[in-house]
Amino acid sequence: MEAKDVNYCVILAGGIGSRLWPVSRKELPKQFLDWFGTGRTLLQQTYDRFRKIIDAKHIFIVTNEHYADLVREQLPDVAQDRILKEPIRRNTLPSVAWATTCISHLCPHGNVIVSPADQLILEENNFDNDVLKGLDFVGHSDCLLTMGVKPTRPDTGYGYIQAHENMEEGAFARVKSFTEKPALDFARVFMESGEFY
């Protein structure tokens, strides 16, 4: 079996986008908007990005049942059984657990990348290469891999990954700590330390 045959992607598209109100609303959250005027919504851009490196039938979309029609409208080529509709919102962990359980029934030793539907990636070729490098790494290691970028400003809307040691760009390191959405004071300390991604 080729490596690409065991690579899967889960795109999380169930958020309500409340931080970007009034443009992003509960009825039409940011992942379903053409945020940057490209002619493609954030969800479509994320799907397109992963479709270049992962087989289309290996891409799952997790969304709230209220957004299932929007997903089908924006991604008509995605098979119905690849759109997982949550009856209620329970944040990230249950969404990831459900999707990876579905994938494990199809491919018990699959490599899975989980991505939000609403991220901005400016250097897509570098991103693609890093994702492929990460999938190759987990394919030969018994581990979880999280990818991060150096913060450019303190932000309370993101998690912060602390590496065990300083590392060069594109390298792998063990995670020392992870802090989910810290208070602004901590986010500032994390950013200024240079140890966090």
Predicted regions and their residues:
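Conserved N-terminal catalytic core of the sugar/cofactor nucleotidyltransferase
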Residues: 1-11, 22-26, 37-116, 122-125, ...
